[in-house]
């Protein structure tokens, strides 16, 4: 940013070359000025539309739009104003006091000014003047410009980044990276996204969109749905549906349909980036200097790019055991969702949410499934809820082998699937066990993709224990122009919606007129096991750690969904509880639900928790009957009372 001149020079007019490029606008009030207001001499008059028309044709309108964008993109500060407007005068005086060169177009002194303002409104979504753009970013009107000046955002926008190829380069084309890229492009910035999928040890790769779209949330939820449909077919007979044909599942048909949908999403992302003017490069990004990055494509060809700012959004990949046969014969979630053959008898190693979700839908599709657990289920989640999830999985036929970890995977037979022998050792002693499986699925955690992108060359610090990147409350690393979002952040939730929100807000802070930060508190999530587990806020263990047990009240109950009654599904399996801070008006600090459609139910309660939900507010809420969600409006029994919470029927 240029320093304000002292004393300010007298006003002087400079004719801007920008209008000459536009051509359709008379050069009456467009000029460049430093340190004072400007009154440029009138220039050649040209009409916006053909003589005799009151409104430009569609072709002329598009031409006008293009030329207005040329003005916005070609000038550091572009002010659309009216000569008699006092608010416009205030803005001009502000930039003059800052010693900043600005360009103006007085809409009351151009031919067809109303049409110009109409198209400008479509571009900026602002009907009034002054209408200010700084470095291609729409700042807004007078009040927003002064607000941006007061909070420092205007000075940030005025920084000249023209020395670099791009305003922003994002490494990683997942949910967070794409969200950040699209928002930055919306703010008028020149953006590049680098995305490259290193094939899994089994050779699996995928398109643009990251883990969630390709090998995570989307295919996982669709396979979960496939399993639920199978269960619904069993219930259907109790509801009077008759069918004689034997029902069986076709794995190949399911994966083909799911991959077709994912392919459409990949293409949609590429189209969206193109429409927004974001450069997408399918290459591996690696820092070589503070503002310089090397992009290597699959052919090994290298290209170098520079940017003013960088966002690291590289995500994570599944971890391997580091034992004989793991990478040769085991698969991970990277491979499962596009597996071209039915996995058959499957051993799932690990009891993370990924492991239990996969075990759940595989069992729901009729497969023989065993889960090998080293320690606890769903580490980091409420452990009472985790054990209930495990119990329901066992009811659905999933077998658990606890306190064991594999030490060898050996191929006995080749095939699709083949046959594998797994040798596992007890975590509590010398005991070993063996098992024969068609497929071994590893779900033991994920590693951040941060160690091979040249961070050490520019001094970005990482947590050496887990590869994650420490950032401040605005996602900034220890290197000021380098930021990070998503699963690679140290100590932050590894959830797609979190990355999307963080990416969008980061772009707005970097290039817009917003100071809003991502709220990492009270984030809802759902584990999509056959009986879904939704939660928001603190686990019971974490709440006790933070508030002490004597300061908490836990309300809970079992319940029986109406839909389960006719089908004869087990009563007293679904469970709901809230954890309340007794000394903060019984504010709800933890929300937990095990039941059908838990994700859909939890979403709404998460919004309520952000607004300070209390037990009294729940009591005052009239429930929708008959639904599962209404159970939270009638909670009466506390854990401390020790009273029985079993239910006799669906209505309590």
UniProtKB/Swiss-Prot annotation:
Q: Note whether Calcium occurs among the keywords.
A: no
Q: Which residues form the Glutaredoxin domain?
A: 65-165
Quaternary state and interactors: Homodimer.
Which residues does FAD bind? 167-196
**Single annotated GO MF:** thioredoxin-disulfide reductase (NADPH) activity
Expressed in which tissues? Expressed preferentially in testis where it is found in spermatids and spermatocytes but not in sperm. In elongating spermatids, expressed at the site of mitochondrial sheath formation. Low levels in other tissues including heart, lung, liver, kidney, brain, muscle and prostate.
- The UniProt record lists the Cysteinyl-selenocysteine (Cys-Sec) crosslink at 650-651
Can you name this protein?
A: Thioredoxin reductase 3
Q: What is known of its domains?
A: The N-terminal glutaredoxin domain does not contain the C-X-X-C redox-active motif normally found in glutaredoxins but activity may be mediated through a single cysteine. The C-terminal Cys-Sec motif of one subunit of the homodimer may transfer electrons from the thiol-disulfide center to the glutaredoxin domain of the other subunit.
Q: Which residues carry this modification: N6-succinyllysine?
A: 388
* CDD domains per UniProt: GRX_GRXh_1_2_like (cd03419)
* Cofactor binding note: Binds 1 FAD per subunit.
Q: What is its EC number?
A: 1.8.1.9
Q: What residue spans carry the region label Disordered?
A: 1-62
Keyword line: Cytoplasm, Developmental protein, Differentiation, Disulfide bond, Electron transport, Endoplasmic reticulum, FAD, Flavoprotein, Methylation, Microsome, NADP, Nucleus, Oxidoreductase, Phosphoprotein, Redox-active center, Selenocysteine, Spermatogenesis, Transport
Q: What InterPro entries does the annotation carry?
A: FAD/NAD-bd_sf (IPR036188), FAD/NAD-binding_dom (IPR023753), FAD/NAD-linked_Rdtase_dimer_sf (IPR016156), Glutaredoxin (IPR002109), Glutaredoxin_euk/vir (IPR011899), GSHR/TRXR-like (IPR046952), Pyr_nucl-diS_OxRdtase_dimer (IPR004099), Pyr_OxRdtase_I_AS (IPR012999)
Regions of biased composition (Pro residues) lie at 1-12
Protein's job: Displays thioredoxin reductase, glutaredoxin and glutathione reductase activities. Catalyzes disulfide bond isomerization. Promotes disulfide bond formation between GPX4 and various sperm proteins and may play a role in sperm maturation by promoting formation of sperm structural components.
GO biological process, any: spermatogenesis
| Keyword Iron carried by entry | no
Mention any additional remark. Answer: The thioredoxin reductase active site is a redox-active disulfide bond. The selenocysteine residue is also essential for catalytic activity.
Q: Where is the active site?
A: 625
List of residues that carry Phosphoserine? 50
Q: Where in the cell is it found?
A: Cytoplasm; Nucleus; Microsome; Endoplasmic reticulum
In the record, which positions carry Omega-N-methylarginine?
A: 34
Cofactor annotation:
FAD
